[in-house]
Curated annotation (Swiss-Prot):
This is Putative pre-16S rRNA nuclease. The keyword Nuclease applies. GO terms for biological process: rRNA 5'-end processing. It comes from Gluconacetobacter diazotrophicus (strain ATCC 49037 / DSM 5601 / CCUG 37298 / CIP 103539 / LMG 7603 / PAl5). Its EC number is 3.1.-.-.
Length: 154
């Protein structure tokens, strides 16, 4: 299944369907869920990153339970905006995941999303390092998905 842009994903969604945002990290995959009006992204949770078939099965369960019609994953572009090895690996992973889950997918620039979330948690929430680690993945997914929703709002 090919990757789509955000406008195409929005156009493919059925009535009352949501988007599931993914922020894949080394150990975990942060998850965020849009509302059905595609205006607001909320943190949803995190999955342990492992075998693709196991991750895909869990995402299929979440998609069925929450009415998800498409996936949006973070795209780790280089700081200068170039498409490097990390972006290529993320793209390949997302194409494979989309095929296994059976949902259309798009990717969105995630540069600095984790940094922005960490900064907010340190400055505004005064959280311990351990508590921040528990929250940062799903909050980064929400931050990335919200950026995609805002940039493509109609």
């Amino acid at each position: 299944m090919p990757l789509f842009n955000m406008h195409q994903i929005r156009g493919q969604l059925g009535r009352d369907q949501r988007l599931l945002g993914l922020d894949p990290g080394q150990k975990t995959i942060g998850l965020a869920l849009s509302d059905v009006s595609l205006m607001l992204a909320s943190p949803y949770g995190a999955l342990r990153r492992g075998k693709l078939s196991v991750v895909a099965a869990e995402i299929r369960r979440i998609a069925a339970r929450e009415g998800v019609g498409g996936l949006v994953s973070g795209l780790p572009l280089s700081m200068d905006g170039s498409f490097g090895p990390a972006a290529q690996a993320a793209r390949d992973w997302m194409i494979s995941l989309s095929e296994q889950v059976g949902l259309p997918a798009a990717m969105w620039d995630e540069r600095l999303s984790s940094s922005a979330v960490n900064r907010m948690l340190i400055q505004d929430a005064d959280m311990t390092r351990q508590r921040r680690a528990e929250l940062v993945d799903k909050l980064a997914a929400s931050y990335m998905l919200q950026g995609a929703l805002d940039a493509t709002a109609e």
